[in-house]
Amino acid sequence: MGSFSIWHWLIVLAVVLLLFGRGKIPELMGDVAKGIKNFKKGMGDDEVASADKSVDGKTVDHKSDEVR
């Protein structure tokens, strides 16, 4: 009673297929994949932008440990 058998999962799968249809499920998965891809791209853009902002503009002369 506490765990799901294979019959429970087959019934759930049948209901999902009836609700969404065969053609709609791949379309939904494609949209989810595009969303994840755009999210990762956005996170990568934020890291690049934050790395550029952390530079304070000072240069170090390697010959004489002097900061200009």
Swiss-Prot record:
Annotated S-S bridges: none
Principal location: membrane
GO BP term (any one): protein transport by the Tat complex
Keywords: Cell inner membrane, Cell membrane, Membrane, Protein transport, Translocation, Transmembrane, Transmembrane helix, Transport
Cellular compartment(s): Cell inner membrane
Superkingdom field: Bacteria
Mode of membrane association: Single-pass membrane protein
Biased composition range(s): Basic and acidic residues: 53-68
Residue ranges of the TM segments: 1-21
Gene3D superfamilies the UniProt entry points to: 1.20.5.3310
Subunit: The Tat system comprises two distinct complexes: a TatABC complex, containing multiple copies of TatA, TatB and TatC subunits, and a separate TatA complex, containing only TatA subunits. Substrates initially bind to the TatABC complex, which probably triggers association of the separate TatA complex to form the active translocon.
UniProt function note: Part of the twin-arginine translocation (Tat) system that transports large folded proteins containing a characteristic twin-arginine motif in their signal peptide across membranes. TatA could form the protein-conducting channel of the Tat system.
Name of the featured protein: Sec-independent protein translocase protein TatA
Species name: Rhizobium meliloti (strain 1021)
